[in-house]
Amino acid sequence: MGRGRYPARLYVTAPPPEIAARYYRSWPAKELYHTPEHFPPVSAEGLFGYNAPLTLEFGCATGEYLCALAAAQPSSCFVGIDIVAKPLYRAVERAVAGNLSNILFIHADARLIYQRIPTAALHSIILHFPPPLLRNRQRNQLLVSPQLLECAARTLVPGGYLSFLTDHPALFALMQELLPAFPALRATPASVEELAVFESHYHRRWAARGRTISGLRIERVMED
């Protein structure tokens, strides 16, 4: 995991079957890569059984931010994805404590999820404080990538947006460098207050250390 993310310190256990059936899915990378058609589409209809605005968070960790959104917006649906299971167990605990019916967590490699999202299925995408993974051998694991932006351009509804926050200047610069290749996306600098309706653990953590937090609202351009 990236800096500041320490799932090994979380003393949590896997949710019992009846809770997992409601809130948790595990999509193994090998199966998702070779037989993606065996997994449901990542859409409100595909995962919740009804149509509603859907927000997807990549790297949701313990689900603190996404659960707060789900509680505040009961008529929308929310899906959190993380490549590490233990933080998601804590996320499920939060969802249970809030008796939330509009949220689901998926243990999976986000990069393999892109292909399972139908066109124009998402109202918004959240990518807040992703690990920079700047060592050379980790470059192919970056969530800030052409593949992410290609996914956003295809899967966001017109007027939908990707909310991006980072405390890492190189990651912010990389996002700005990649965006011109995607004319269907329009990026606008945005303050933390504009993008984050709630301060997550990592938001508080990096702000407390005095790090500068930069944000972009990356909107899917309305079609003519």
From Swiss-Prot:
The keyword Methyltransferase applies. One of its GO terms (biological process) is RNA (guanine-N7)-methylation. CDD domains: AdoMet_MTases. Its EC number is 2.1.1.33. Pfam families: Methyltransf_4. PROSITE patterns: SAM_MT_TRMB. It catalyses: guanosine(46) in tRNA + S-adenosyl-L-methionine = N(7)-methylguanosine(46) in tRNA + S-adenosyl-L-homocysteine. Belongs to the class I-like SAM-binding methyltransferase superfamily. TrmB family. This is tRNA (guanine-N(7)-)-methyltransferase. It comes from Chloroflexus aurantiacus (strain ATCC 29366 / DSM 635 / J-10-fl). The gene is trmB.
